[in-house]
Amino acid sequence: YTSLDPVLQEEAEEACAEQNARMAGMGPDLESALVAMEPETGLVKAMVGGRDYYESQWNIATQGGQPTGSTFKVFTLVAAIEQGIDPDTKIDCTSPMDRPGAEPLENFGGADYGIQTIENATALSSNTGYYRLTEEVTPAAMNEMATRLGVGGEFVPNNTPTAVLGTENC
């Protein structure tokens, strides 16, 4: 018995192939992976572990220890909402963002989004906006939310705002 849905599996494979095509030329080791789960049951409905498991014998989705990328932004968002911060609240998404003692922080491609609502910052996946929001809600609240929502295993929280940018390996 498998919980995989053949239609969703095909769509997942197509989505990853399209993403891999978009990333072509951006770096030799870039490839996408995807896991789609049914929230009510935790059953895996679709999974793509990379370009070709038979070639690499490596499933990025299950064996990865990969940086979390922008996925931690959702934990900051939920922590913010729980703290009473409305998604219509404005947040500074300008780029680059100076940080004392650290390299300037930029949005992907150096994009300067200006002032945005948190909702728009989420749609844009603004690194600078979410860094600032994480400072406001606290990295500890973001990590606590991640744990409450099921991030576990070898996850060791990094209680710095950069964790929202994908500096954690899970």
What do these predicted ranges mean?
Residues 1-23:
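Conserved, well-ordered alpha-helix/loop/beta-strand core segments that scaffold catalytic motifs
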Residues 2-10, 65-71, 112-116, 124, ...:
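Soluble non-cytosolic domains of exported or imported proteins
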Residues 12, 41-42, 64-91, 121:
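Active-site SXXK
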Residues 28-54:
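A short, well-structured edge-of-sheet supersecondary motif
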Residues 52-64:
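A short, polar/charged loop-to-alpha-helix boundary motif
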Residues 85-142, 159:
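Conserved catalytic neighborhood of penicillin-recognizing serine enzymes
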Residues 137-154:
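Short, charged, amphipathic alpha-helices and their helix-cap/turn boundaries
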Residues 152-170:
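Active-site-proximal helix/loop microenvironment
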